[in-house]
Amino acid sequence: MPLTLRKLKTFHGRKGPLLLIIMDGIGMGRQDESNAIYVAKTPNLDRLFQSDLFTQLKAHGTAVGLPTDKDMGNSEVGHNALGAGRVFDQGARLVNKALESGKIFRTDIWGDIEKRAMLGGTIHFIGLLSDGNVHSHIDHLNILLDHCVESGIKRVRVHALLDGRDVGERSALDYVIPMHEKLKRISREKGLDYGIASGGGRMKVTMDRYNADWEIVKRGWEAHVLGKGRPFKTAIDAVETFYAEDPKMTDQYMGPFVITDDQGQPVGPIRDGDAVVFFNFRGDRAIEISRAFTEKVFSEFLRGPLPDIFFAGMMEYDGDTHMPPYFLVQPPDIDRTISEYLCEEGVKMFAISETQKYGHVTYFWNGNRSGYIDETLETYVEIPSDRVEFDQAPKMKAVEIKDKVIELLRTNQYRFGRLNFANGDMVGHTASMEAAIIAVETVDQCVGELLTVINEMEGIAVVTADHGNADEMFTIDKAGKKKPKTAHTLNPVPFAIVDPGYQGEYRMAHMEKQGLANVASTLLNLLGYEGVEDYDPSLITMR
């Protein structure tokens, strides 16, 4: 299909620019004390939520390509849908299909993994031990393990990264105990050697992203490969000890640990001749550890010699750098994003966020492709994120992003801009209500200032989010006790158009099923173009 756009006959956009403001983690939750957005003072958002040009969008489950409507949305699939204008099957759904059909085990890649085992090597599975279904799902690991048993693989090690973010913040034992018992039972009943070898919390070990802190990856490398870390007899002992030593400790922040035998030796360091499978399906926190396992020339930390191993990811985590080189499940093939159409039309645009969400407004927005579509038309700006836990600095870089956006707008060079405020999501993940309120109020203030500039420039702003998080900071258990909630929510997200020049040229369509994929056509309409034929329909109807 050609990348051509047709102009609307009745609406040609406004004199000024179109600005898309993505408030990461800002959903439409219950109006009660669990909702940081409701509790916070947000005069600007309050006005938007009451305006005539306001609606709500689905941002989870099947609306963003995930298997069921019980699945939380996330920033990756959210920005894919926003930028692509259509819904594509995403990581978990693709992996489910490959595992259920057995297709994954008929690939040459799986054959190469098994060859290592048949020659005496160990198969290592590294990944997030969780059913959060955001980065991974423990069911996928269980199917992989069961197939190894059926295939007679003699030695398997699991390197268990603890979640506490997309699931309960102190829920690690709900996953570690069954996994420990499963591997022990396999070893006893089948005469095989299966067990947990190492682990640690996802925010301390292995799962860094966007080059924010390579020390996290280094700690993972040392635990998984070198067998260096705090020693324990079992992973259960490790978790229980961390809890006992610090009653405030949550799973995602646990340090690296290594399981040792009766002689104090690590039971499963990765050695020459082994195979390694990183079983997370989401890419952002899988790229760096994949680089460490595959790049011969590597300088991010003192890695030492690269072991002679075969490494495969569950999926290709970066389609442009082809990282990792070998993977088990093909990613969605996303084509014809809105930015490709706008570049073809010669529309100048910018994208900006801080490090934590920079990849979302660029790579994921562009259909999982790195770099510029047309460097002569696009400007990408990354504001370095703070290297602290975000409840300690809940304002993050929102003010700096806002200031840079205003600077870019006032050059009068850009017809379209997009930005992401990370606060609602990153601070929401800490489960600190006090910090989340500050985060939300900061975003509200920044949105207000941007709307003032858009008004001055006679432009249009669209304010939305990619998924919820800060809208549900805790739940209430049966005993009436508050349980901190660090995960994303299943709530819809806001969508508001701020058009100071509005004279009734269009109205909200209010469709029965509307989600993030409807935004791209809406943006095209607001720029004066018809929607693309096979994009999900616009959220506005021209009069």
Specify the residue positions occupied by each region the protein language model found:
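Feature captures the catalytic ectodomains and active-site-proximal regions of enzymes
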Residues: 1-543
